[in-house]
A protein has these predicted regions:
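Short loop/turn segments that flank or connect secondary-structure elements
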Residues: 1-261
Length: 261
C-alpha cells in the first residue's frame, strides 16, 4: 500500500485497516543498498526529533536544518505546520546525500530507518476525541516498493530491533497526540473564519514551539516533554471551549505576550 498517497489524499480508514500489521506480522524484504529510496522521494515528512538529530550532528540550529533541507506549509487536512523534505538536483535526490551516501546514516529520520515499513497511530474513531487519544495503538504497514528483494522474511518486531527503533516509542505517541489535538483547534479556527491575523500568529507560535525552540546542546526528549506538558493543557482547554471563547483566549494571550511570533 502507498501510505504516503493515502495520507496525502485522505483515504478511507477501512481501506487502511485491511493493511495494518502488528509486531508479530511478517513481510518479505531485503535491502540491496541500491539507493533508490533516497531519490525521487517527495513524501518524507520530518518530525521535531528528526530535525533535532540532524541539527545536533552538524552543530546547526533546527531552523538552519529546515531551511537547508525542507519546505514548511499547512497540511491539507490537518492545517498544522508540516516540514516536508525537498529533493534536490538533477537526480532529484535527498538533500542529505553527500557523494551518493547518506550523511546522517547514524541518525537518519525515522521514516527512512523504518523503510519499507510505515507507522501509523490507530484508534476507535467511534469514540470521542479524548478517548481516542487515550487509547492510541501503534500499527504498521508495508509501503509499495520497487527496490530490494523478497529473499528475507522479517517480523515487524525484528525489523524495529535491527534499526534501534523502540516498540513503545514515547515520542511517537506523544507527538501524534499533541499534533491531533492541536490540529482540531486549528481546523476549528479556520472553519469559524477566525481573524486571519490571529490565525497566522497562532500557526507561527505552534510552528516555533513544536519545531524550533530546542537547544541542540541538550537532550531532546526532556525538552519535548516539557513543551508538551505546558502546551497540552491549553490545547485541551481550547478544543473543549466554544469557538468565540477560543478566539477571545488567544487574543488575550497574544496581547500579553506580543504578536511578533
Amino acid at each position: 500500500m502507498d501510505i504516503h498517497k493515502y495520507l496525502r489524499e485522505g483515504g478511507n480508514p477501512d481501506e487502511l485497516e485491511q493493511h495494518l500489521m502488528d509486531l508479530d506480522s511478517t513481510f518479505r524484504f531485503k535491502c540491496r543498498r541500491c539507493g533508490k529510496c533516497c531519490k525521487n522521494q517527495d513524501t518524507i515528512i520530518f518530525t521535531p526529533r528528526d530535525i533535532y538529530n540532524i541539527a545536533h550532528k552538524f552543530g546547526k540550529t533546527m531552523e538552519q536544518v529546515i531551511e537547508e533541507t525542507s519546505e514548511v506549509y499547512p497540511g491539507r487536512d490537518s492545517r498544522m505546520p508540516i516540514v516536508h523534505m525537498v529533493p534536490r538536483g538533477p537526480k532529484n535526490a535527498c538533500p542529505l546525500l553527500v557523494d551518493g551516501r547518506c550523511s546522517v546514516h547514524d541518525c537518519k529520520p525515522t521514516v527512512c530507518a523504518l523503510f519499507p515499513l510505515g507507522r501509523v497511530v490507530w484508534f476507535d474513531r467511534t469514540l470521542p476525541l479524548e478517548q481516542q487519544l487515550d487509547n492510541i495503538q501503534v500499527r504498521y504497514i508495508v509501503n509499495d516498493i520497487d527496490c530490494g528483494s523478497a529473499k528475507r522474511v522479517n517480523t515487524v518486531c525484528e525489523w524495529l530491533a535491527r534499526f534501534g527503533i523502540a516498540e513503545d516509542d514515547e515520542f511517537f505517541i506523544r507527538w501524534n497526540r499533541l499534533f491531533i489535538r492541536t490540529s482540531s483547534v486549528m481546523r476549528k479556527l479556520e472553519e469559524a473564519h477566525c481573524p486571519p491575523a490571529l490565525l497566522v500568529v497562532f500557526w507561527r507560535t505552534v510552528y516555533k514551539d513544536f519545531y524550533l525552540n530546542y537547544d541542540t546542546s541538550k537532550e531532546f526528549m526532556p525538552q519535548f516533554l516539557s513543551m508538551a506538558d505546558q502546551v497540552e493543557p491549553l490545547i485541551r482547554e481550547l478544543d473543549a471551549a466554544p469557538i468565540q471563547r477560543v478566539i477571545q483566549t488567544l487574543e488575550e494571550r497574544y496581547a500579553k505576550t506580543g504578536t511578533d511570533q
